[in-house]
Amino acid sequence: MESVIFSINGEIIQVNKEIITASPYNFFKRIQDHHLKDEAIILNGINYHAFESLLDYMRWKKINITINNVEMILVAAVIIDVPPVVDLCVKTMIHNINSTNCIRMFNFSKRYGIKKLYNASMSEIINNITAVTSDPEFGKLSKDELTTILSHEDVNVNHEDVTAMILLKWIHKNPNDVDIINILHPKFMTNTMRNAISLLGLTISKSTKPVTRNGIKHNIVVIKNSDYISTITHYSPRTEYWTIVGNTDRQFYNANVLHNCLYIIGGMINNRHVYSVSRVDLETKKWKTVTNMSSLKSEVSTCVNDGKLYVIGGLEFSISTGVAEYLKHGTSKWIRLPNLITPRYSGASVFVNDDIYVMGGVYTTYEKYVVLNDVECFTKNRWIKKSPMPRHHSIVYAVEYDGDIYVITGITHETRNYLYKYIVKEDKWIELYMYFNHVGKMFVCSCGDYILIIADAKYEYYPKSNTWNLFDMSTRNIEYYDMFTKDETPKCNVTHKSLPSFLSNCEKQFLQ
């Protein structure tokens, strides 16, 4: 029986010529046309056993493909050009792709020009970008490849600080391509991360490119209040949909977002004060009751920092309290801080670096009702007095911006709204131009290079230029807004000395 001889890495395999003649595949057709009878055909880049598997497929239309042999069979099928086997191998690889092998499969798909596998592995990288940074192959991605990945609209980053950490880890392996840092959008980064990048000697150029990463755009949580039940909804710029997260039957509560969970703190149910704190995961929509606070209270002030939820002051029945305590996310124990110097409810609290600033609100007992203008700072495990606000305010909203505090006041007893800036290093207050007036409740948060205010309309205040933008929007019956991101960048005063520790903490928090 006449045979065709193949040589693979010095090993000989003889194939019945009838199999070659009957083959519909181009590789074997060319052999029929050009084969020299007594010469072995040398096959390079093909595994001997993989070639045997292809021959079995040609004979019986069956082939044994496993996760262990799929790559060598696919390589052989690509070189020999056996499309049905290529398809079977690609399906097997796509079915088994995960965050630990997606970069290897991505590189494999490029090497052999397999588009379906390329798309699938790219999708896996995009969905698991923080996990794949631990892969030794991550640093071998080209600058253009990483730029493409991080510019994809669905890349799974929830804060631009996370994008920055991904880039810094890649730059560590590719120091000649530091200009990739320019894909960052500084206005979506925290001041702490911007300072860290500056201390590394890296400069982010001003960009006019559109923001493509949907995940870094601010998500919005809205609690729409009614007389008895408040509805919580969540808007994701990634999906561009509003979804109902759940309901709460509380009044006079406070709310804050930490690590993708909305905390509903204190308040009243059926005119009774409550200890409890409820938490809803904004992705899974699952509710959980966390450990009770130390006392019954409503109208507390809250702030978050370094993975902790801080609850300060509040109203215990008809008396203001000076209790300050915090709960670390994922734990069940409240930690008490020293009490405020002046008990209060309805004040504002905000972190600057690792210090808490509390201002305004109301001090009340059974005999007294005093609207406050005083300011306290918790630093080095004690409360100290700071310069008071220019006026007394019972409703105060405060945000940190570029190391200073901006305060907008609401209206109860006051006749108008005010905007103040507190210069932290100078312990000094200055009054700024206020665009709107006669608004009671509102939402205020820092959004990159501007401060967002949602009141009777949507406003953007730009501190550096002291200018305002106005956008019409309906805010009827909506009394609480919050913008949130999944991750909390550790807030600290980053210096050359503390920079390695800061970056190490960020890497542990964001990329592991």
From Swiss-Prot:
Residues 2-67 form the BTB domain. Pfam families: BACK, BTB, Kelch_1. Kelch repeats lie at residues 216-261, 262-307, 309-354, 356-403, 405-449, 452-498. It comes from the Viruses. Keywords: Early protein, Kelch repeat, Repeat. InterPro entries: BACK (IPR011705), BTB/POZ_dom (IPR000210), Kelch-typ_b-propeller (IPR015915), Kelch_1 (IPR006652), SKP1/BTB/POZ_sf (IPR011333). Gene3D superfamilies: 1.25.40.420, Kelch-type beta propeller (2.120.10.80), Potassium Channel Kv1.1, Chain A (3.30.710.10). Belongs to the poxviruses Kelch family. This is Kelch repeat protein C2. It comes from Vaccinia virus (strain Copenhagen).
